[in-house]
């Protein structure tokens, strides 16, 4: 039986479990070399590993919480203004769309666009939905839940995005 022995320099850091930023929520912030060729980081040195914690922090926040009293969506949209964002409810779904036209940044010109669609729980009071954008770019979509005996109405309507002057105090989970 032949066993192939690989030098540790050619092993990929954490193998298939190594998180890739390629499809994360970056909205055009640029790619690093390790995003396209993640195995190169481990070929430099057998002891070099890209920080997993930094990768998680760099990915922005996209969190959905649903507890007994409310439904909450936290979405990092720091590159968009309230005018660039559209939030609407269609039946049992909330759709969040962000788009800004081409503008200049440090590296040239860039335009960004994203679509997110979330299913609302059936017991969310759709008449009391709210959406706000904090000063640090955190979009908060919130809806209280109704008692199980009450029925929430389902139709299409737009939810205005209000701007808050203070940064978000999004609790980490």
From Swiss-Prot:
Q: Name the positions where Zn(2+) 3 binds.
A: 154
Q: Where is the segment annotated Required for complex formation with BFSP1 and BFSP2?
A: 1-63
Which parts of the sequence carry N-acetylmethionine?
1
Please give the residue positions where the record annotates the modification N6-acetyllysine: 99
Using the record's annotations, give every residue carrying the modification Deamidated asparagine. 101, 123
- sHSP domain location is 52-162
Database matches in InterPro entries: A-crystallin/Hsp20_dom (IPR002068), Alpha-crystallin/HSP_16 (IPR055269), Alpha-crystallin/sHSP_animal (IPR001436), Alpha-crystallin_N (IPR003090), HSP20-like_chaperone (IPR008978)
Q: Where does Zn(2+) 1 bind?
A: 100, 102
Cellular component terms (Gene Ontology)? cytoplasm; cytosol; nucleoplasm; nucleus; protein-containing complex
Per the entry, what this protein does is: Contributes to the transparency and refractive index of the lens. In its oxidized form (absence of intramolecular disulfide bond), acts as a chaperone, preventing aggregation of various proteins under a wide range of stress conditions. Required for the correct formation of lens intermediate filaments as part of a complex composed of BFSP1, BFSP2 and CRYAA.
Q: Could you give the subunit structure recorded for this chain?
A: Heteromer composed of three CRYAA and one CRYAB subunits. Inter-subunit bridging via zinc ions enhances stability, which is crucial as there is no protein turn over in the lens. Can also form homodimers and homotetramers (dimers of dimers) which serve as the building blocks of homooligomers. Within homooligomers, the zinc-binding motif is created from residues of 3 different molecules. His-100 and Glu-102 from one molecule are ligands of the zinc ion, and His-107 and His-154 residues from additional molecules complete the site with tetrahedral coordination geometry.
Spell out the protein name for this chain: Alpha-crystallin A chain
Native source organism of the sequence? Procavia capensis
* Gene expressing this chain: CRYAA
